[in-house]
Amino acid sequence: GSICLEPKVVGPCTAYFPRFYFNSETGKCTPFIYGGCEGNGNNFETLRACRGICRA
């Protein structure tokens, strides 16, 4: 879906949530640290969820 094309958003908060996002340049789901607020849809709790939705 289109959420897979959204940019990675860490957000301004300083929590530490290991998440995955779909990197549209590489075509792969990639780990990143999410700050906990003001994110977007390209933010998955598991690699499997990211791959399932973005078909990586």
UniProtKB/Swiss-Prot annotation:
Keyword Disulfide bond: yes
Chief location bin: secreted
Pfam families per UniProt: Kunitz_BPTI (PF00014)
CDD domains tied to this protein: Kunitz_SHPI (cd22618)
Gene Ontology, cellular component aspect: extracellular space; nematocyst
Record-linked Gene3D superfamilies: Pancreatic trypsin inhibitor Kunitz domain
Domain BPTI/Kunitz inhibitor: 4-54
UniProt keyword annotation of Secreted present: yes
Disulfide-bond pairs as recorded: C4-C54, C13-C37, C29-C50
Chain positions of site Reactive bond for trypsin: T14, A15
Compartment list: Secreted; Nematocyst
Record InterPro entries: Kunitz_BPTI (IPR002223), Kunitz_BPTI_sf (IPR036880), Prtase_inh_Kunz-CS (IPR020901), TFPI/VKTCI-like (IPR050098)
GO MF term (any one): ion channel regulator activity
Classification via PROSITE patterns: BPTI_KUNITZ_1, BPTI_KUNITZ_2
Keywords: Disulfide bond, Ion channel impairing toxin, Nematocyst, Neurotoxin, Protease inhibitor, Secreted, Serine protease inhibitor, Toxin
Anything else known: Negative results: intravenous dose (up to 1mg/kg) has no toxic effect and generates no behavioral disorders in mice.
Function statement: This protease inhibitor shows two different activities, it inhibits both the capsaicin receptor TRPV1 and serine proteases. It partially blocks the capsaicin- and acid-induced response of TRPV1, a receptor of the pain pathway. It also weakly inhibits trypsin and chymotrypsin activity (Ki=0.5 uM and Ki=7 uM, respectively). In addition, it may also alter tachykinin levels by suppressing endogenous proteases. In vivo, it shows antinociceptive and analgesic activities. It significantly prolongs paw withdrawal latency and blocks heat-induced and chemical-induced acute pain.
Similarity remark: Belongs to the venom Kunitz-type family. Sea anemone type 2 potassium channel toxin subfamily.
Name of the protein this chain belongs to: TauPI-stichotoxin-Hcr2d
